[in-house]
Curated annotation (Swiss-Prot):
Highest taxon above the source species: Bacteria
Annotated pathway: Cell wall biogenesis; peptidoglycan biosynthesis
Cellular localization per UniProt: Cytoplasm
Organism: Rickettsia conorii (strain ATCC VR-613 / Malish 7)
Function: Cell wall formation.
Active site, per annotation: R168, S217, E287
A molecular-function term among this protein's GO annotations: FAD binding
Similarity comment: Belongs to the MurB family.
Cellular component aspect of the GO annotation: cytosol
Name recorded for this polypeptide: UDP-N-acetylenolpyruvoylglucosamine reductase
């Protein structure tokens, strides 16, 4: 019998995750848990005597949940983890805060350096985890430190150097949940910041299929190369498997055309990797995460 820790937050069993993802595919979470606050999360982790497998879930913007669902507990940090506050000339931001919301907050408060976030879907926690970046900036450029908790329930702090930011990755321990990020503040001009944000939004809408069911960039760019160019060169623009296709508009974006399964999407991505490797000798690395069980 499955015995769950006593918590103040909310449990849901056999919870459908499909509606939480941008691709709108995938199976159910065996257990879905939204902690009330960081102390509630700590209590859950300490009590997790059965050592149930744990996965964390953000905005669902760059993830494929496999059709067999996710075993164990999926933890989603809700609105109580999305606060933005000023402390000693720094911003402390909850990990579930959306990148877009932080960009808007910074513009309203004449804080520069965060404009690029308006073009990156997802949460602050996810952005830190993958060192998300666009339009010449990355999270490594603005993060001072993060506050996190490990799966044993220990609160930890990591500086920018300790995080070890790399291209779309970092050196943080795997069994870690990011709670907050601390950012440095550089004052700017609100109107100029808004102009830059609008430039980024316009550039994004003119080059990316933002109105489709997509998960953002499918593959990370190899050093000195562009993934979309390699995909295009291999003749895979618009290529389709089942209900999934590579976008005609931007061929490093995978799209659910309405009836795709998670398997369709993952099979398509793996096929593209194989064909690009055969054509160009380059092995593309997934930027979209794939988690869960195959059916």
């Amino acid at each position: 019998m499955l015995i769950l820790p006593i918590v103040k937050g909310e449990y849901k069993k056999d919870y459908n995750l499909k509606h939480l993802t941008w691709f709108k595919v995938g199976g159910n979470a065996e257990i879905f848990f939204k902690p009330l606050d960081s102390e509630d999360l700590k209590s859950f982790l300490i009590q997790n005597k059965q050592k149930l497998p744990i996965k964390t879930f953000g905005a669902g913007s760059n993830i494929i949940i496999r059709d067999g669902g996710i075993e164990g507990v999926v933890i989603k940090l809700g609105q109580n983890f999305s606060n933005i506050e000023f402390v000693d000339n720094h911003l402390i931001v909850g990990s579930s805060c959306l990148n877009y919301n932080l960009a808007k907050f910074c513009q309203a408060n004449a804080i520069s350096g965060f404009e690029f976030l308006v073009g990156i879907p997802g949460t602050i926690g996810g952005g830190v985890a993958m060192n998300a970046g666009a339009y010449g900036s990355e999270f490594k450029d603005i993060v001072v430190q993060i506050e996190a908790i490990d799966f044993a329930g220990n609160f930890l702090t990591f500086t920018n150097e300790e995080i070890g930011f790399k291209y779309r990755s970092n050196n943080l321990p795997k069994n870690l949940i990011i709670l907050k990020a601390v950012f440095k503040i550089n004052k700017g001009d609100s109107e100029n910041i808004l102009l830059r944000m609008n430039e980024i939004k316009n550039a994004r809408s003119s080059t990316q299929p933002i109105k489709e069911r997509t998960g953002g960039s499918t593959f990370a760019n190899p050093e000195g190369r562009k993934s979309w160019e390699l995909i295009d060169k291999a003749g895979l623009r618009g290529y389709r498997i089942g209900g999934a296709s590579m976008s005609e508009f931007h061929c490093n974006f995978m799209i659910n055309n309405g009836d795709a399964t998670a398997k369709d999407l993952e099979d398509l991505g793996d096929f593209v990797r194989q064909k690009v490797c055969e054509d160009s000798g380059v092995k593309l690395e997934w930027e979209i995460k794939r988690i869960g069980r195959h059916p």
